[in-house]
Design a protein with these regions (language model features):
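Short beta-strand segments
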Residues: 21-23
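Nucleotide-activated sugar donor-binding and catalytic core shared by glycosyltransferases
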Residues: 1-17, 28-145
Length: 145
């Protein structure tokens, strides 16, 4: 729990008053509540449906997550993403995309957030074959056999 406290406090401090919109599962929300972490810019809410979550992502300056799927969405949309893991289910998100892995290290999170807040985040690009043409390629393969 102490590490969660340090991560949350780092996010709040480094956000410098910018709103932190944090959809969290119940057990994480409860853990944060039990730690007594509050800030005027911290908005904790339950997980959101796909469309509203997509809206939130599109409006974000950056994303902090532990989800590989969220890192994928961020890479596809060109949104800076900080992943609180030492691995990624989709390595292309950090190899060529907008994702950076910082683990659960508050110091690494602080450095990444400093880079993000200064506007110096890596640009990233779409990984190969993330062009939205998958169905077209599948049809091509099926009709050529």
């Amino acid at each position: 729990k102490e590490n969660l406290r340090q991560l949350m406090e780092t996010m709040i401090e480094k956000a410098d008053g910018m709103p932190i919109v944090a959809p969290m599962h119940t057990y994480v929300r409860n853990a944060v509540k039990d730690l007594g972490i509050e800030a005027p810019n911290l908005h904790i809410m339950p997980p959101q449906n796909y469309l509203f979550f997509g809206y939130l992502i599109n409006k974000a300056k950056g994303i902090i997550t532990d989800s590989g799927n969220v890192a994928e969405e961020a890479t596809f949309l060109g949104i800076p993403c900080i992943t609180l893991n030492t691995y990624a289910e989709h390595p292309e998100t950090w190899r060529v995309g907008t994702n950076e892995l910082v683990g659960e290290d508050p110091s690494a999170l602080a450095r990444a957030m400093d880079t993000l807040m200064k506007g110096e985040w890596k640009k990233g690009e779409l990984p190969e074959r993330w062009d939205g043409r998958t169905a077209e390629r599948i049809v091509q393969i099926l009709t050529n056999k």
